[in-house]
Structures are given as C-alpha cells and as structure tokens.
Amino acid sequence: VDPGGRRVLLITDELSPATNLGRMIQRMRTCFSGGIETIDLSAEGPQGDCQGCLRCADANICVYQGHDAFMELFRDRVMKADILILAGTVTDRYLSARWKRFFDRSFFMGHVPALRGKQIGLLISGPLTQNANLRQILEAYIEMQQAHLAGIATDAPTFSGAIDDQVDALAQRLVACAEHGFIGSSTFLGHSGRILFRDEIWGRLRFPFRADCRTFRRLGGFDFPQRHWRSRLTNALLLFLSSFAPFRRHLQGRMTDEMIRPFRRYLKTR
C-alpha cells in the first residue's frame, strides 16, 4: 500500500518476532511501501509515571521536562504523524504497564484532542473479543481525540492466513480513509465526553487548566453560552493572579491538596 507521502507511525511495547504481536507488526510493516516509522515503548517510552501534579495544566509542559524525552517524542513524532498504528497485548484485562504509562503521561496535553484528524488502527494480541471494557476504553480514547478508528486487527482467528488478511485490510483502510480525510461520526462515547469537558473547562476547570481553555477557544470548543457566574468570576480572579510568578508557584504547591479537599470528609481515617 502506498501511503502517498503520509507519515505512518507504529507505537508498540513488543517487537519480538517470537510473539503473535511481533509477527503482526512484521506483517503490517510489509504492507506499506517504503516502510513505517516505529516507536518501541520499552526503549523510547516515558521513564517515569505521571505524578498527578497538574504542573502541565498551565502551558502543557510536563514536570518531567529535562528528565526524559517523552514530551518531545509525543509532540515531534506522535502528533506529527498522519496515520497511527497502536500495537499491544491484552494483559490483565488491559494493555501492558508501558501502555498505561504512555496514556497517563500523554495527559500533559490536557483534555484537548491532540490527535485530531488522524487515522488510527489497532493491532491487539489477546482475547479482545472477550473484553468489551478494554475495547470501549480504546474506542472512547480515539473518539475523544477527534480521530478516526479505521479498524482493529487481532490474533483471535486460529488460522494465520486470516490474521494476515485482517492486517492487510487494516493497512488498506488506513490509507483509504487518509486519502479521503474521513472521520467517522462520533458515538455517545465521544459526543458526551466532548460536552462534559467543554462544560468543565469553561466552568470549574478553567483554572488551573489554562492551556486547555486557550485550545478549546481556538478550536471553537466553547459552542454554547454558560451562566456559571460564580465560577466565571472566581476563575477570572485566579487567572489574573496566576500571571504573577510568586502567586503561581504558591498555587502549584497547593494543587494536589486542593484537588482532594472536597473529599477530605470522606477520606478521614478513624
């Protein structure tokens, strides 16, 4: 398949040719003329877990900046690809810990659709057909990114030729959808998620998620009026005060405590 000059990127946590996933990846590579770029999460992935500190909320800059290269990898390679292929193995009813870390750390981009307009294919080894929850998580993630799930290839068939046919068909669909710029209609997963984050980023979460607010405004995400005057006035004050570095540092130091403050009465130990 000729991708027509489009950038194709495969992200995986397993490249061993001794595994089903490794063999599916090898087959996918042969489907594209000129080869495809690959990111091996075991070698190039993030080196630490998300700290939940929300330092990224102000300007999409992770607290790990300077400690690993994940932020640059995500921006320069993942976000600049036209076609993404995510490859993983079902592990304990989810994907591997490396994939979990990848998804968690990519939150430095906040709630915005960082993969907007991309064609995404999934190569999954393991009983995905028996794990509706995992499938829905992956589908929701892609819809929330305003990307298009071109298809899923698994090793569920016992006949290797059938698996090869799935992989070949997925490669063809990825290129065909990219050529036509096709993005499928959003289901409840994507539509409700978009509305939820639209409301929250406009209202209660406008501070501290200043970067999200700017991006939502630029993309036309705030597509209805709101009258949450208390939240709007509070956020206006905090946005103004946070323009001063000493106050911003003070707020960042209290961020974690403030996030759990509404739940303290439920978290008290005897």
Description of each model-found segment:
Residues V1, R116-D155, I163:
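Short, glycine-/small-residue-rich phosphate/pyrophosphate-handling segment
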Residues V1-H111, L149, D165-A171, V175, ...:
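N-terminal beta1-alpha1-beta2 submodule of the flavodoxin-like/Rossmannoid cofactor-binding fold
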Residues E14-P17, V90-D92, G126-T129, A156-F159:
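Short histidine/acidic/glycine/proline-rich micro-motifs that form metal-
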Residues L41-E44, A153-S160:
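Short beta->alpha junction loops
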